[in-house]
């Protein structure tokens, strides 16, 4: 109850303290994400150096395969030691935000950094961005635990850390902010917003001091696509929506494939993608690791459609195989690479058929990255901001928005569940779904009241609030209103609720239904 009393007595002080908490989280999450990014960058460089050295030396090829098997065994042991470090890491953070999971922050940090580095050194088709989100969140959780912050502040700081991790991974602070709100929280208040912004900006500042000011993708967009050609974007959006739904289906089937290997202990299954990676090293090395080599191929060379299609299909199934094993690594960057290749193939065909200038090919590549991301993750605003920041220009905002909206609708109509929600559901099922064990802790959460929601224009006492929560205050603009039974709730208010942490996930979902906008059928 101490945190509630503090908030009621000094709500502005609570918000101000969150700014400094965000700065602190941004420093530590940014440093950890930068270290992780440096390790993975150097691991990838070392990988291609090893391939170049061994490819004409059979003896050293055999030695390299032995090393790959050993690395697979080490990673497998790490994942058995700390299971929450497997996979992307984003579903685990979502689960903790909802109160379903309680990760061991220092074990996750150690196993994720070591395991992720070994996976990239081994050539597995995994990304650094999802792990960076988890590393940032765990760094924030560690700070909150060490400094003995309240449960409410710990959740805020973890959300901030997750965004800061993404900001450092992509040099994209706005995308980091929006990802935290759109994908992790689903709603927000001003206190949370300033905390996340301060963390993401601080983290991005640290990242840019190490990696420079250049965007992650150095695309040179000559001109925006003329409005007369927007029919091409409609078709592209439909294609990306279909491909995004198929991507989600295959990624989950990849997990099913490894899950069916009942006779092989889980810690040994990760060896399989390392062995397959060894074969890929000497047959199609461009699809190894995150995919930076693939991007340079379509931006610096003119490839045949058949060549791009081969690389696309190979990268797609190799990524599904690697991710399905439970290896510590994400799908964030690889899916952007796949989106880029879908755009390159589509753009090449459209340019050949319509005769529009060839420099529009880069437009199709960048737009497709955002559209494919949106179809898979179902976070359109994050997708638009991420690609805009990564390419260093906001001139193509309209075309990005058109494709993202269409791909979102197509994937939704196909009833394709957002990938991270599907993965979280599997994690909860695997762990027997245990709510947080901290039954004596209470957490303050904010819920925005939507226009036309159940709560709008109702008295507090007339709403069937779920058990295990207490409505504390209503934030209406800059005004802080003590919630009483006779208090009327307005659309646009932010309801502050005190929730038993043992029932956080269930209560949060119930209040979101009450406060969310009702969409007519």
Across the structure, where does each feature detected by a protein language model lie?
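Alpha-helical transmembrane segments and immediately membrane-proximal extracytoplasmic
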Residues: 1-432, 450-451, 476-477, 492, ...
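Short, solvent-exposed coil/turn segments
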Residues: 93, 440-442, 482
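Acidic, Ser/Thr-rich low-complexity segments on the non-lumenal side of membrane proteins
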Residues: 110-118, 440-469
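Intrinsic-disorder/low-complexity, polar/charged segments enriched in Ser/Thr/Lys/Arg/Asp/Glu/Gln
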Residues: 294, 442-446, 494
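A structural signal for short secondary-structure junctions
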Residues: 365-366, 376-377, 439-441, 464-466, ...
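Long, charged amphipathic helices and adjacent flexible linkers at domain junctions
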Residues: 419-446, 516-521
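Cytosolic Rossmann-like ligand/nucleotide-binding regulatory domains
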Residues: 451-505
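Short, compositionally biased
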Residues: 486-487, 507-521
């Amino acid at each position: 109850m101490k945190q509630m009393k503090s908030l009621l007595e000094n709500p502005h002080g609570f918000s101000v303290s969150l700014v400094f908490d965000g700065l602190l989280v941004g420093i530590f999450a940014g440093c950890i994400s930068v270290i992780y990014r440096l390790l993975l960058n150097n691991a990838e460089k070392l990988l291609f150096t090893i391939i170049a050295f061994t490819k004409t030396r059979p003896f050293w090829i055999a030695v390299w395969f032995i090393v790959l098997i050993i690395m697979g065994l080490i990673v497998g042991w790490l994942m058995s030691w700390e299971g929450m470090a497997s996979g992307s890491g984003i579903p685990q953070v979502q689960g903790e935000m909802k109160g379903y999971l309680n990760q061991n922050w220092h074990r996750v940090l150690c196993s994720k950094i070591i395991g992720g580095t070994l996976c990239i050194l081994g050539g597995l088709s995994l990304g650094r961005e999802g792990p960076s989100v988890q590393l940032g969140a765990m760094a924030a959780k560690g700070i909150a635990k060490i400094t003995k912050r309240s449960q409410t502040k710990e959740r805020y700081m973890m959300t901030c850390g997750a965004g800061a991790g993404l900001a450092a991974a992509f040099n994209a602070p706005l995308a980091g902010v929006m990802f935290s709100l759109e994908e992790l929280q689903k709603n927000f208040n001003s206190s949370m917003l300033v905390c996340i912004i301060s963390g993401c900006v601080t983290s991005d500042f640290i990242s840019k001091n190490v990696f420079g000011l250049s965007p992650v993708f150095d695309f040179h967009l000559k001109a925006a696509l003329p409005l007369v050609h927007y029919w091409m974007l409609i078709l592209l959006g439909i294609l990306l929506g279909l491909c995004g739904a198929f991507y989600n289906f295959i990624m989950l089937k990849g997990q099913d494939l490894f899950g069916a290997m009942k006779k092989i202990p889980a810690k040994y299954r990760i060896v399989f993608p390392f062995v397959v990676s060894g074969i890929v090293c000497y047959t199609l090395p461009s699809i190894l690791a995150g995919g930076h080599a693939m991007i340079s191929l379509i931006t610096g060379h003119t490839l045949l459609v058949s060549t791009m299609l081969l690389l696309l299909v190979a990268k797609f199934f190799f990524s599904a195989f690697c991710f399905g094993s439970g290896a510590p690594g994400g799908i964030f960057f690889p899916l952007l690479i796949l989106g880029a290749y879908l755009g390159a193939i589509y753009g090449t065909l459209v340019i050949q058929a319509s005769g529009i200038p060839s420099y529009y090919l880069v437009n199709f590549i960048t737009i497709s990255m955002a559209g494919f991301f949106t179809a898979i993750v179902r976070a359109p605003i994050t997708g638009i901001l991420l690609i805009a920041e990564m390419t260093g220009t906001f001139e193509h905002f309209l075309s990005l928005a058109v494709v993202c909206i269409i791909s979102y609708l197509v994937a939704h109509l196909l009833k394709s569940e957002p990938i991270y929600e599907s993965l979280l559901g599997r994690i909860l099922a695997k762990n027997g779904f245990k709510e947080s064990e901290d039954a004596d802790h209470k957490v303050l959460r904010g819920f925005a009241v939507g226009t036309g929601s159940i709560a709008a224009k109702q008295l507090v006492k007339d709403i069937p609030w779920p058990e295990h929560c207490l409505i504390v205050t209503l934030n209406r603009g800059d005004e802080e209103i003590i919630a009483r039974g006779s208090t009327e709730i307005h659309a646009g208010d932010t309801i502050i609720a005190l929730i038993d942490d043992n029932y956080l996930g269930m209560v949060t979902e119930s209040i979101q239904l009450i406060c969310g906008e009702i969409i007519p059928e």
